Regions:
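Vicinal oxygen chelate
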Residues: 1-2, 45-48, 82, 91-135
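C-terminal "cap" of GNAT-fold acetyltransferases
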Residues: 37-53
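Amphipathic alpha-helical segments
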Residues: 17-30, 94-97
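Mid-chain, well-packed structural core segment of small domains
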Residues: 69, 73-97
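A short, acidic/glycine-rich surface segment
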Residues: 32-33, 63-68
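N-terminal beta-strand motif that seeds the catalytic metal site of vicinal oxygen chelate
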Residues: 1-18, 75-84, 134
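Short, structured motif recognition centered on aromatic/hydrophobic residues
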Residues: 6, 10, 23, 47, ...
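Short secondary-structure junctions
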Residues: 27-36, 99-105
Length: 135
């Protein structure tokens, strides 16, 4: 598995438009993409700093994992995403190391990335997402 860099930091928010005001207007970070990811029951807004992205996440339903996160911990940093060269190879390597994954097979996330999440129990408390860029 080769880590290519930090792809984005995922931030759970109650209101995308309210949060967008800070990231887009105050910090003047370029908004590049808005997308609903139905499989994860979230709506996203992505801001690109040219050295990594900020992904704002808000729930689309009350049974969304982002909704549960906000209810339990409040808005804030949800996960760190690392880009990998090969998601399937990464999954095999992580399983060999007995790393706990939240999904055994890659899902399609925002921007078409193939994604898998690593349980915080395996990372010292941080939810880590691995993502392979679409070809």
């Amino acid at each position: 598995m080769k880590i290519l860099g930090i792809e984005h930091i995922g931030i759970a928010v109650n209101d995308l438009n309210e949060a967008s005001s800070f990231w887009g207007k105050v910090l003047n970070i370029l908004h590049t993409h808005t997308e609903e990811v139905q499989s994860e029951k979230v709506s996203t807004k992505i801001y690109d700093t040219n050295k990594g992205k900020i992904e704002l996440l808000t729930p689309l339903s009350t049974n969304s994992l982002i909704e549960k996160f906000i209810n339990k911990k409040g808005p804030g940093i949800h996960h760190v995403c690392l880009e990998v060269d090969n998601i399937k190879a990464a999954i095999v390597e992580l399983k060999k190391e007995k790393i706990i994954l939240l999904n055994d097979k890659p899902k399609i996330g925002a921007e078409g990335f193939k994604i898998v999440f690593i349980h915080p129990k395996s990372t010292g408390g941080v939810l880590v997402e691995l993502a392979e860029k679409p070809s």
